[in-house]
Swiss-Prot record:
Record NCBIfam families: clpX, PRK05342.1
Protein name: ATP-dependent Clp protease ATP-binding subunit ClpX
Gene: clpX
Organism phylogeny: Bacteria, Bacillati, Bacillota, Bacilli, Lactobacillales
CDD domains: RecA-like_ClpX (cd19497)
Organism: Lactococcus lactis subsp. cremoris (strain SK11)
Keyword NAD included in the entry's annotation: no
Length: 411
């Protein structure tokens, strides 16, 4: 291309002559003036900005996320707040990176560690958040993972689950959330948690480190072990949010020991927790390291949130209040057969007590109700005369049968 001085030449786009513009660029039988070039550049820049803006994720505020969690999750206020802020900052970071506002600033990922007893709602919290954000979500069990050379799953199979959840849309998967449960089980095998650490467990932690901190991983599309000549899917994990959780049974003793030593060494100015207080809320990185997680792994999980053990009152609320409350679900199932279902207060309390006795927390509630409801749901559809079923405390304890009210009984 070149500039030309022929006054008879006109711009092929706007029609202006050589004399009306500063520059005229010649191509193969076409000409374009400097004004059209400037206009085209502005149009391209605007279109690129629109594309960039469309790539930015719509992020709910921490308050909006917290309110959404409150609709489904009872209690755990501190954990819900910590999660909402961490998730908000994570997706704000992705948008910040996409906007290229400040290329000289690098924001680190806010991966999260949830510590709490079985059935306290760790998995459900992560699942509910992902659903509210409309991002792909996958759950993995750390106990099924092994390092290279051992029988078991490669850590890359976690990413395969996320790809499957996103219908193999790699771009969506790269903005998803992965929850890894039972992370405490790869920390140790010995009961003496402060001295011995399981070697293969440490190997799994090392393998997880790479994908958690951000890397381009090769994922076998069919799962299983990787082998030569197998086609791989490349997925960048730098924008995937990892939430890991575990019960960390016994970590309270490590916290007690640390706090006790401080009191002996520095006098009464240090805080001493009473038996009623939750030591879980006092956990720091040092305690988690003593439990058996390696420092590098802990360093990739900057947000630590402790969940409290659920009380009877919490479990009763879980049964009755959330949008997806189990009692509401069972009532609706029977309502499809025009039958009213009533759980007496004593029955709800008995269900909660059983869950606490079994140490299953909220996740054990459904199985307790199923034990009672199975026969009812089997019989009711065959008896059109039944209009109401009443469940009492004695029914839950196996000492009585459910009360069935029939149409004839009302007359």
């Amino acid at each position: 291309m070149s500039n030309t001085q022929n006054p008879n030449i006109h711009c092929s786009f706007c029609g202006k002559s050589q004399d009306d513009v500063k520059k005229m660029i010649a191509g193969s039988d076409v000409y374009i003036c400097n004004e059209c070039i400037e206009l085209s550049t502005r149009i391209l820049e605007e279109e690129l900005k629109e594309e960039q803006d469309s790539e930015m994720l719509e992020v709910k505020t921490p308050k909006e996320m917290f309110d959404h969690l409150n609709e489904y999750v009872i209690g755990q206020e501190k954990a819900k707040r910590a999660l909402a802020v961490a998730v908000y900052n994570h997706y704000k970071r992705i948008n910040f990176t996409a906007s290229k506002i400040a290329e000289d600033i690098e924001l680190q990922k806010s991966n999260i560690l949830l510590i709490g007893p079985t059935g306290s709602g760790k998995t459900f919290l992560a699942q509910t958040l992902a659903k509210s954000l409309n991002v792909p979500f996958a759950i993995a069990d750390a106990t099924s993972l092994t390092e290279a050379g051992y029988v078991g799953e490669d850590v890359e199979n976690i990413l395969l689950k996320l790809l499957q959840a996103s219908d193999f849309n790699i771009e969506r998967a790269e903005h998803g959330i992965i929850y890894i449960d039972e992370i405490d089980k790869i920390a140790k095998k010995s009961e003496n948690v402060s001295i011995t650490r399981d070697v293969s467990g440490e190997g799994v932690q090392q393998a997880l480190l790479k994908i958690i901190e951000g890397t381009v991983a090769s994922v076998p599309p069919q799962g299983g072990r990787k082998h030569p000549n197998q086609e791989m899917i490349q997925i960048d994990t730098k924008n995937i949010l990892f939430i890991v959780g575990g019960a960390f049974d016994g970590i309270e003793e490590i916290v007690k020991q640390r706090l006790g030593e401080k009191i002996i060494g520095f006098g009464a100015n240090n805080k001493k927790l009473s038996d009623e207080d939750s030591y879980m809320q006092e956990i720091i990185a040092e305690d988690i390291q003593k439990f058996g997680l390696i420092p590098e792994f802990i360093g990739r999980l900057p947000i630590v949130a402790a969940l409290e053990r659920l009380t009877e009152e919490d479990l009763i609320q879980i049964l009755t209040e959330p949008k997806n409350a189990l009692i509401k679900q069972y009532k609706q199932l029977l309502l499809f057969d025009n039958v009213e279902l009533e759980f007496k207060d004593g029955a709800l309390m008995a269900i909660a007590k059983k869950a606490i006795e079994r140490k299953t927390g909220a996740r054990g509630l459904r199985s307790i109700i199923e034990e009672v409801m199975m026969d009812i749901m089997f019989e009711v559809p065959s008896h059109e005369e039944i209009t109401k079923v009443i469940i009492t405390e004695a029914v839950i304890d196996g000492k009585a049968e459910p009360e069935m009210i029939r149409e004839a009984d009302k007359k």
